[in-house]
Amino acid sequence: MRFGPNVVEHAPFSISMIGNTATGYVIGLTPEGAAVCHRMFSEDVPEAEVAAVNADLPVHLRRGGFVVEGERADEGSLGKSVEGAEGTESAEGAGGAESAGAENAAVAAFSSPALDSHAPLQSAYLHVTHHCNLNCIGCYSAVDARNARRDLTLDELRGIIDALADAGCQHVVISGGEPFLRDDLADIVAYVRERNIDSVDVLTNGTAVTPEKLAAIAPYVGRVSVSFDGPNAETAPVIRREPLFERLVAAVEMIREAGIAPHIIPTAHAGNIDALGEYAVLADSLGATMNFSLLSAPLENDELAAVIPDDAALARLAQATLALSRDGVPVLSDTPVSTRLTTTCGCGAGCAMVSVSADGEVFPCHMMHDEAFSLGSLLEDPGCLAARRAPAPRVGELAACADCEIRYLCGGGCRARAYFATGDVEARDPYCALMRTFYRLLFEAMLGRN
């Protein structure tokens, strides 16, 4: 048995692991397992020798796509030993690990967004309007004179949807501006489904939804997500700057009554980290699912700087996130922290996912609508999606992450946040302390269970 490409070895918190960055699979190893796996980067190890370490290890190596078979195994060393692993006893992952026996534990495989620009496009944000009736601080899609700008026509948007579908996209998130300000929103989402794109979500600020508009999109949309500020009417609105709580609750109820799955997205910031559990209670009371977004601030935004969490607040956020995680579902968006471990070398922005602005321009993700990262215009060149590329190197090539023991768990975090905070897309994610604390607590919990 010999490793193929995309296999890495590492030892977060002194626990030996191998992972496959293409499949997301993680296997925790004993020192004996780590030693035999280390050899598989450079030699073909007999399967019987691998099984002698643990009978289930070959099963998990095949299930996770770690090994090459037959002639490919004779082509030379395809795997890449990234980090020497000095192991201890392995731990079963919280939230549903697959056991590989008493001596080794293999965490269940989860899809990891590819960083291969030749891989099919998996998902895309499609911003259908610049127009918005709110003025939230930190809005990622804010542009000058947004309400004076021309919206793309339905035919122009259909052309963009054609390009996304032809590139293999299977999930579209409709965003804005405020999508419900468009009278033809139902026509847009209907065409997405007509092009056999599997799922469509809509993001909204919740103030422009009506039962009629929801009924029109209900046959085509799987989920409508509503941005929330405070968890109750008494909390001061930090992001939206005007009291909207009751209107947002009414919007979620309308969404549910229309037969669409409601979802709420509060923004986690320095002012509400200690009240995150209240949002979970709110979501449950509304029959909605939930995750938090993380507040990101451009260098020059002094208004936002006052509510960006410091490292102490991020440590508390990590504790709250672990407490709120349910069945491995990530509580934080744009941050790979959940109770199910996965191997990743990056978030997939620019390769597995893209974002199309309300002008038809393509960017790596919805947080990177900056001309420095433009991949082209779908209005001018529908084929520009073929030139997709990541905005930054893989985590193993990032100097800021070179000595970090969790880099193949977090994938380097969010490159957009790094760029916002420092002006350098290869810099350390300003939320690094959150991820490090989260994984430390998670591993402590895992070890405590075994």
Region roles according to the model:
Residues 5-28, 55-89, 96-125:
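N-terminal [4Fe-4S]-dependent radical SAM core
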Residues 36, 43-51:
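Short acidic, hydrophobic short linear motifs in intrinsically disordered regions
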Residues 149, 154-178, 182-296:
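Radical SAM/AdoMet-radical enzyme domain recognition
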Residues 117-155:
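Canonical Radical SAM [4Fe-4S] cluster-binding loop centered on the CxxxCxxC motif
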Residues 141-150, 369-374, 407-444:
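Iron-sulfur (Fe-S) cluster-binding segments and ferredoxin-like electron-carrier domains
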Residues 161-177, 427-450:
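Short Fe-S-cluster ligation motifs
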Residues 38, 311-341, 361, 365-412, ...:
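C-terminal accessory region of radical SAM enzymes
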Residues 346-351:
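Short, small/polar residue-rich loop motifs at catalytic or cofactor-binding pockets
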